[in-house]
Amino acid sequence: MVAPGLVLGLVLPLILWADRSAGIGFRFASYINNDMVLQKEPAGAVIWGFGTPGATVTVTLRQGRETIMKKVTSVKAHSDTWMVVLDPMKPGGPFEVMAQQTLEKINFTLRVHDVLFGDVWLCSGQSNMQMTVLQIFNATRELSNTAAYQSVRILSVSPTQAEQELEDLVAVDLQWSKPTSENLGHGYFKYMSAVCWLFGRHLYDTLQYPIGLIASSWGGTPIEAWSSGRSLKACGVPKQGSVPYDSVTGPSKHSVLWNAMIHPLCNMTLKGVVWYQGESNINYNTDLYNCTFPALIEDWRETFHRGSQGQTERFFPFGLVQLSSDLSKKSSDDGFPQIRWHQTADFGYVPNPKMPNTFMAVAMDLCDRDSPFGSIHPRDKQTVAYRLHLGARALAYGEKNLTFEGPLPEKIELLAHKGLLNLTYYQQIQVQKKDNKIFEISCCSDRRCKWLPASMSTVSTQSLTLAIDSCRGTVVALRYAWTTWPCEYKQCPLYHPSSALPAPPFIAFITDQDPGHQSNVAK
């Protein structure tokens, strides 16, 4: 994975945001500035910063000459911080936020302008999240299409590491800004994420109110760097050992990115998170990913809920991109299919009991042989963002009768006497092309098992029959698309007919010889 150069040097504006009259040490948190989006109702947005211990801080929300509300607090002596929770606000704006510190009749004032209320989404992960609009298909057209989205505001966190949890960001690459072709296409793997931007743009098209997008990602990084020590301990992750440099090219030390790039944001009120990571774990703690990923989600949720004084939902929506593919890996390598499976906590679908209120974009059919950034970095981020936003509309916004996931079998029936395996799906299926290798059966004989292809025999709108007569022993399991590169671009065999969403990969045990799994894959 590509690891960008460390971008620092944006600390100076932390002082310049405030009026010249501001006292030394009195300031907003690093990400509270002009053009920002604050979380709308039903939650209350959090405004916080640093000040002189014992001082009183009055936060005023204004629109034009009208005062909307005032909140009064004091600076805590042990942390030099102050915080208020605004009353829930309807989407819209612009507003001005003013903070005034008073100590012994001396006042210092801070102001930020053009503040909107809407939904705030945090986007994180490694380089596929970090890729910019400049790097994707039809970049010129996408970069020219910003004028209609001035209510979608963007913020990008600088790649930074820390040994301990930080209270505030050290630096930012891009302060809250209106989108332009310059800040969306500012080089490769830096500033604003293409997936994040396109996801937010889809949300704005649907919701028609302000969207705030925060990009905090770093290429070549394993999940351990983004996880707190608490969540890693819960999964029994061993202490730092050797890391495979072919897949982990960014920071790998446990928790250093959580400490510096995520924890400082936890006081913010969020709507949700979108996550694109996993490539750096295909040969590193792969077997633990089915624990470390759900644990990360749970820990982020708990920390943001607590940090925002309960304003961020305890189980806020969490979206993920299931891994695409990589031409440099052998098709027999198990890393990619294992991580794809573990990204669902080994259920094959989300949400599930271990990952509630989550949604997923399947990307295994979006391969890109000719990507100048390597096939591990496919350029079609438009489809990724579109599939993500469908999940958000269904899970985060409660839109009914919306197809947001591809078909999974709900029943697998072994007809051994006929040499057939029958799959019944809970959705309609469309066989785009017959592939006699993408389904495989585990055939066991004399205590030895091997995977054999199972060809498609007959297909109907919600069922599929596989021929398994190649197995002379006992069929104990079935898997689908269990390879690094399952198909060419948008050419996997199975899709949902109206939504064009691909069937996700799965593995299922179809006899009681392995009682740990059932043959019902889907919900």
Curated annotation (Swiss-Prot):
Glycosylation sites: N107, N138, N267, N290, N401, N422
InterPro entries: SASA, SGNH_hydro_sf, SIAE
Domain of life: Eukaryota
Compartments, as annotated in UniProt: Lysosome
Enzyme class: hydrolase
Catalytic activity, EC: 3.1.1.53
Main location: other
Pfam families: SASA (PF03629)
Signal peptide (UniProt feature, chain positions): 1-23
GO molecular function: sialate 9-O-acetylesterase activity
GO biological process: carbohydrate metabolic process
UniProt keyword terms in alphabetical order: Glycoprotein, Hydrolase, Lysosome, Serine esterase, Signal
Catalytic reaction(s) noted: N-acetyl-9-O-acetylneuraminate + H2O = N-acetylneuraminate + acetate + H(+); an Ac-O-9-sialoglycoconjugate + H2O = a sialoglycoconjugate + acetate + H(+)
Record GO cellular component, one term: lysosome
Function per UniProt: Catalyzes the removal of O-acetyl ester groups from position 9 of the free diacetylated sialate N-acetyl-9-O-acetylneuraminate (Neu5,9Ac2) in the cytosol and of the diacetylated sialate residues of sialylglycoconjugates in the lysosomes. Together with the sialate-O-acetyltransferase they regulate the balance of acetylated sialoglycoconjugates, key players in various processes such as cell-cell interactions, host-pathogen recognition, and tumor antigenicity.
PANTHER family for this protein: SIALATE O-ACETYLESTERASE (PTHR22901:SF0)
Name the UniProt record assigns to this protein: Sialate O-acetylesterase
Provenance organism: Pongo abelii (Sumatran orangutan)
